[in-house]
Curated annotation (Swiss-Prot):
Protein name: Elongation factor 4
InterPro entries hit by this protein: EF-4, EFG_III/V, EFG_V-like, EFTu-like_2, G_TR_CS, LepA_C_sf, LepA_CTD, LepA_IV
Function: Required for accurate and efficient protein synthesis under certain stress conditions. May act as a fidelity factor of the translation reaction, by catalyzing a one-codon backward translocation of tRNAs on improperly translocated ribosomes. Back-translocation proceeds from a post-translocation (POST) complex to a pre-translocation (PRE) complex, thus giving elongation factor G a second chance to translocate the tRNAs correctly. Binds to ribosomes in a GTP-dependent manner.
EC primary class: hydrolase
Length: 606
């Protein structure tokens, strides 16, 4: 049976994705589905097939959306084409999820039958329901002794509000219940709507850059067909290209020569310009595509956290820029602009979704593009109301205008929803209070409690997620959205080394935290700056006021060692000479600040 006949019917296509929290077994479940449908041979089936980046494997998290097309022979004798789009589960990557969901008609909500529901799955599940997807609850890890499916099914109903009485109970690890799950999938997820005869309309779900092929785009066709050799046009750039390769992922790339309405696959059109196929764009045919509407893609995500990134050697600047461009293609939420710093030279101010995203981007740049990078402390965007009535936005502390010209500073506030087991509620509440949070709501849901807080974003992005995990033994989960800008008493904390301001070490902090923060910072820097031949003074200042100071003592050579007894004036002469030399050195001497010192600012836990 040729592929053409087999895929002639829309009713036999099922597009779905998996929603799950970190560690609830999403990647194992997808491995198992691929194995059952024979997408890979036993030999090729390594753990977490879809996590293709080394980094994803090491950290055990999914970062990028991936897709697989599988053929499943159901009990009714029909062969169904399952298009499965993998989604990440970490809070920093929620935009990836909304993108993947847009291309599907159904979603499997995977919940760990031992742990219960987590905040991130709740957020993603709401997104799925809003987009009109059919959500099937799946209780995973049924082979574990601590699995308690009835309690968890009850939690799913209470917290998310979807019927979980007949949820699929599976163990992806042992393969228990997997066949039944696929049958449910085929039965309950609606087939895609679309007309293969209509003009082409396709959505770019993801793009990445290949050095040989140019831009490869993962697309979902809503109407029409796309064949090798077709002339296509991107709606946003209005540029036309000729299709070089069309096909599906099985997870490997496999050319098929044609994609029809309702299918998910890849398109390569020899686009060498990185901005040629932006994610979320609509593809139409070059001829007659003018009347086709643009698909309501997904809103461009605004970065929440900014940090300066600088190549360690200034010769790498061009390579760094190329690397950022290629990465930004694959990661629609990266935002960057050139920046230069007195201490670190030329680099970029890069915007991220959160600190995990920042670490991952830095690691990908260093691994995939062999760059050595310095990263400054992450900051959020502040809104400044100036005295002349204009409003400015600042994400870089060293670019803050003079305090005398600022009427008021406003910091971004987020609304955070935290799900936590009852035993740890006290810890979480006191952590939120410490971070200047205001409690809005507290709901008891089965054995878990949902806390709703308003917190300053600067407190959340630094290390809140890690702290939350550690005070709740890993059970608490967090999901947050930007609410508004709110006036706050904010000040800029500068670090002076030997009287020179180091712009890369400046941070914006709340006035109440300025003294302890300044002290901690100075102490930390003292440990990290190597001793010089002269005293190095480290000061933390607010405006003109020094709030903390410490000195790295000079190394000293014993110049009087060669005098055996004798006249004291001779010794004094040598000591005076040494003193004068040190003084001269201090005026011209430059203090090298090691990379660790910049990182110390990132890891400052009050």
């Amino acid at each position: 049976m040729s592929r053409d006949e087999k895929n002639a019917t829309l009713p036999h296509i099922r597009n779905f994705s998996i929603i799950a929290h970190i560690d609830h077994g999403k990647s194992t479940l997808s491995d198992r589905i691929i194995q059952i449908c024979g997408g890979l041979t036993e030999r090729e089936l390594k753990e977490q097939v879809l996590d293709s980046m080394d980094l994803e494997r090491e950290r055990g998290i999914t970062i990028k959306a991936q897709s697989v097309t599988l053929d499943y022979k159901a009990e009714d004798g029909q062969v169904y084409q399952l298009n499965f789009i993998d989604t990440p589960g970490h809070v920093d990557f929620s935009y990836e999820v909304s993108r993947s969901l847009y291309a599907c008609e159904g979603a499997l909500l995977v919940v760990d039958a031992g742990q219960g529901v987590e905040a991130q799955s709740v957020a993603n599940c709401y997104t799925a329901v809003e987009q009109g997807l059919e959500v099937l609850p799946v209780l995973n890890k049924m082979d574990l002794p601590q699995a308690d499916p009835d309690r968890v099914a009850h939690e799913v109903e209470e917290i998310i509000g979807i019927d979980a009485s007949d949820a699929c109970r599976v163990s992806a690890k042992s393969g228990l219940g997997m066949e039944a799950l696929l049958e449910r999938l085929v039965r309950d997820v609606p087939p895609p709507k679309g007309d293969p005869e209509a003009p082409l309309q396709a959505l770019i779900v993801d793009s990445w850059f290949d050095n040989y092929l140019g831009v490869i785009s993962l697309v979902r066709l809503f109407d029409g067909t796309i064949k090798k050799g077709d002339k296509i046009r991107m709606k946003s750039t209005e540029r036309a290209w000729e299709v070089g390769e069309v096909g599906i992922f099985t997870p490997k790339r496999k050319e098929t020569g044609i994609l029809r309405a309702g299918e998910v696959g890849f398109v390569v059109a020899g686009i060498k310009d990185i901005h040629g196929a932006p994610v979320g764009d609509t593809i139409v045919h070059a001829k007659g595509g003018e009347d086709v509407a643009r698909l309501p893609g997904f809103q461009k995500v605004k970065p929440q956290v900014y940090a300066g990134m600088f190549p360690v050697s200034s010769d790498d600047y061009e390579d760094f820029r190329d690397a950022l461009e290629k990465l930004a293609l694959n990661d629609a939420s990266l935002d960057y602009e050139p920046e230069n710093s007195d201490a670190l030279g030329f680099g970029f101010r890069v915007g991220f979704l959160g600190t995990l995203h920042m670490e991952i981007v830095q690691e990908r740049l260093e691994r995939e593009y062999n760059l050595d990078l310095l990263t400054t402390a992450p900051t959020v965007i502040y809104e400044l109301a100036m005295k002349d009535g204009e409003t400015r936005y600042v994400s870089n502390p060293s670019k803050l205008p003079d305090m005398a010209d600022i009427e008021e500073m406003r910091e971004p506030v987020v609304r955070a929803s935290i799900l936590v087991p009852q035993d740890f509620v006290g810890n979480v509440i006191s952590e939120c209070e410490q971070r200047r949070g205001t409690q809005l709501d507290m709901l008891f849901l089965g054995s878990q409690i949902q806390l709703t807080y308003e917190l300053p974003m600067s407190e959340v992005v630094m290390d809140f997620f890690d702290r939350l995990k550690s005070i709740s033994r890993g059970y608490a989960s967090l999901e947050y959205n930007f609410e508004r800008f709110e006036a706050a008493k904010l000040v800029r904390l500068d670090v002076l080394i030997n009287g020179d301001r180091v712009d890369a070490l400046a941070t914006i902090v709340h006035r109440d935290h300025a003294h302890p923060r300044g002290r901690a910072l100075v102490e930390k820097m003292k440990e990290l700056i190597p001793r010089q031949m002269f005293d190095v003074a480290i000061q933390a200042t607010l405006g003109g006021q020094v709030v903390a100071r410490s000195t790295v003592k000079a190394l000293r050579k014993n110049v009087t060692a060669k005098c055996y007894g004798g006249d004291v004036t001779r010794k004094r002469k040598l000591l005076e000479k040494q003193k004068a030399g040190k003084k001269r050195m201090k005026q011209v001497g430059k203090v090298e600040i090691p990379q660790d010192a910049f990182l110390a600012v990132l890891k400052m836990n009050d």
